[in-house]
Amino acid sequence: MNYQEQDPEVWAAISKEQARQQHNIELIASENIVSKGVRAAQGSVLTNKYSEGYPGHRFYGGNEYIDQVETLAIERAKKLFGAEYANVQPHSGSQANAAAYMALIQPGDRVMGMSLDAGGHLTHGSSVNFSGKLYDFQGYGLDPETAELNYDAILAQAQDFQPKLIVAGASAYSRLIDFKKFREIADQVGALLMVDMAHIAGLVAAGLHPNPVPYADVVTTTTHKTLRGPRGGMILAKEKYGKKINSAVFPGNQGGPLDHVIAGKAIALGEDLQPEFKVYAQHIIDNAKAMAKVFNDSDLVRVISGGTDNHLMTIDVTKSGLNGRQVQDLLDTVYITVNKEAIPNETLGAFKTSGIRLGTPAITTRGFDEADATKVAELILQALQAPTDQANLDDVKQQAMALTAKHPIDVD
C-alpha cells in the first residue's frame, strides 16, 4: 500500500490543492513557488531528527550531519546579506520577531512600529498580537498626501514618545524604505533599530532594494516570499547581539529546530546567491510596475501611493462598489487569488477592508512576463466592471486559465 492509499482523505485534499495552485493566478504577495530541491529537503529524513541547541553545542547526539546543514544555511545567509551573524532556526517570521524583541528589550518597554492600516504587520504592535500585549507600542503611519513614509514626522513622533526600539519594515508598503534615515532617527532618540524585511528580503538580496543590514542592530525576515524558500524565519544581526539572540530563539521561544526546513532554507539561500536570481527579482518588480500602470489608468480603483517600487501594491477598491473581502471572494471564483487589505485610515475593519493587496513573486516564478502581468491586471478590472454578469466572469476565468496553462508549475 502506498502512502496515498494509506490515507486517501488527506491526499485527496493535497491533490485538490495542487490543482488549485496549477490553475489559479497567485497574487498573494507573501506566497511563492519553491524549487524541487527545497520541496525535497522538507520531505527528507531530516524530519526524523531532534537537535536542540546549535552546531557543535547540541543537547542530543547524532547531529554531525545536521550541524553541516545548519552551518551551510548560516554561512549562506551571512554571505547573501553581508551580515556578521545569522540564526536560521526561527520557525516563522513572527517567531523571529518575538526572539528579536526578547533579545533587545524588556516587557513594557516603549517601541514604535508601522501601524497595521499603514501596512505594518501584526507583530509590529497590534493589540491582538503578543507584541502589543507585552510591549508598549505606538504606531507610526504614512503621509496623508503621498501615502508614503514621512521621516520628519516619524522623527518628531519618536522625539515625543522616546521609544527604546524602532521597528522599520512592513507587510503592505510598496515604496522603498530608507533605512539610513531610520538609523539616524533611532540615534537621535537613543533607540535601537530593528528591521523586518520579510517581504523585501529577496529584492534586498538581489541588490534591488536598500540593504538594512549595515544600518540595523537586528534584521528579521521570513525565508519564503521573495526569497523563494521554505516557510520559516531568520535573524541577522551585529555579532555583539548573537548570544542574546541565540538564547532568545532557543530556549527562549522554541525547542528543537525543524532540521528539514533548515535544509530547505540552505538550498534556497544557495539558489538566491546565483546570478539568475537577480534576473528573477528584477522581473518581479517589472511585473508589479506593469500591473500598477494598468490600475493607475483606471477610474475603478486607486493604487495606494500611486505605484510600487517592489513586488506588491495595495489597491483601494471602494469605487467599484465592493469591499476588499467581496473582491477577494469574487476574484477567487475566476481563479485569481488575492487577499483583502486595509488601506490607510481604514474605516471598514479588518474583516471587510477597503482594499486588496497584490504581489508578483509567484506569477514571476511561473514565467509570467510584463505582458502577462498587464493582462492579469486587465482581467481584475474586467471582473470588477461587471461583478454580477456571469458571462463576463466566465470569460475572465477562461482567460485566467489560458495564462496559467501557458505557464504551468512543474510539480513532477
UniProtKB/Swiss-Prot annotation:
Keyword terms of this UniProt record: Amino-acid biosynthesis, Cytoplasm, One-carbon metabolism, Pyridoxal phosphate, Transferase
Broad EC category: transferase
PANTHER family recorded: SERINE HYDROXYMETHYLTRANSFERASE, SERINE HYDROXYMETHYLTRANSFERASE 1
Site entry: Plays an important role in substrate specificity: H224
Residue runs in coiled coils: none
Swiss-Prot/TrEMBL GO biological process terms: glycine biosynthetic process from serine; tetrahydrofolate interconversion
Cofactor(s) the protein requires to work: pyridoxal 5'-phosphate
Cellular component annotations (GO), alphabetically ordered: cytosol
Keyword Cytoplasm: yes
Gene Ontology molecular-function annotations: glycine hydroxymethyltransferase activity; pyridoxal phosphate binding
Chain sites annotated for binding (6S)-5,6,7,8-tetrahydrofolate: L116, G120, H121, L122
UniProt name for this protein: Serine hydroxymethyltransferase
Protein's pathway: One-carbon metabolism; tetrahydrofolate interconversion; Amino-acid biosynthesis; glycine biosynthesis; glycine from L-serine: step 1/1
